[in-house]
Amino acid sequence: MPPHLIDGQPHQHIDRPRRVRQPGEPLRIGIGGPVGSGKTALVAALCRTLRDEISVAVLTNDIYTTEDADFLRRHAVLPDERITAVQTGGCPHTAIRDDITANLDAIEDLIATNEPLDLILVESGGDNLTATFSSGLIDVQIFVIDVAGGDKVPRKGGPGVTFSDLLVINKTDLAPMVGADLTVMARDAAAVREGRPTAMISLTEDPAASEVLAWVRAHLTEAHQTDHAH
């Protein structure tokens, strides 16, 4: 699919109501986090398993390129028509939080091309710890950080670390090399997240991202049960 563009002009915040998923609509899961934290690799890992179980598609957000979508296509994690991209310009958070129009249009195109869909993974462009998804765009969100930033990152907090539905601390296999204490990271994450779950993963040691996969499956099951209750 051709990329959806944001024109690069200043954008005003557009207030949208919180999304209420309708029966039969695909579940939308946002995956955000800083540059290099492993978002695209996590998306690829989830797709490799879920593509044999459900109907899934991916929407990526890149600043000026379609690099993340191209990576997923090169690695054939899904058929090309199930992967599309939004080019966000210089402010990647704008496209997922303030003016989500381009993402909503891209989602409509994915659904029209691939219906029926069970799940759409929406990957944000790389941003800082303050980036979050609009509740009008996604149903639940995952925020990915990695140990390379040091064990102080969970303690710093920020909306993504604190309020995401699932916090993923990635690349745990690198902890000894960067001097990060995983126990400290887990403790600090628990302190700021007030009971929200945290998954500590290494795609090197667990290529399927089993803990994250289980969380996604649980939300898919919940969505399926909700549909059948109507």
Swiss-Prot record:
InterPro entries in the cross-refs: CobW/HypB/UreG_nucleotide-bd, P-loop_NTPase, UreG
Positions that bind GTP: G33, P34, V35, G36, S37, G38, K39, T40
Domain of life of the native organism: Bacteria
Gene Ontology MF: a single term: GTP binding
Subcellular localization(s) per the UniProt record: Cytoplasm
GO biological process terms, semicolon-separated: urea catabolic process
The entry's keywords: Chaperone, Cytoplasm, GTP-binding, Nickel insertion, Nucleotide-binding
Gene3D superfamilies: P-loop containing nucleotide triphosphate hydrolases (3.40.50.300)
Pfam families: cobW
Cellular component terms (Gene Ontology): cytoplasm
Family statement drawn from the similarity comment of this UniProt entry: Belongs to the SIMIBI class G3E GTPase family. UreG subfamily.
Known partners and oligomeric status: Homodimer. UreD, UreF and UreG form a complex that acts as a GTP-hydrolysis-dependent molecular chaperone, activating the urease apoprotein by helping to assemble the nickel containing metallocenter of UreC. The UreE protein probably delivers the nickel.
Role: Facilitates the functional incorporation of the urease nickel metallocenter. This process requires GTP hydrolysis, probably effectuated by UreG.
Protein's name in the database: Urease accessory protein UreG
Species whose genome carries this gene: Mycobacteroides abscessus (strain ATCC 19977 / DSM 44196 / CCUG 20993 / CIP 104536 / JCM 13569 / NCTC 13031 / TMC 1543 / L948) (Mycobacterium abscessus)
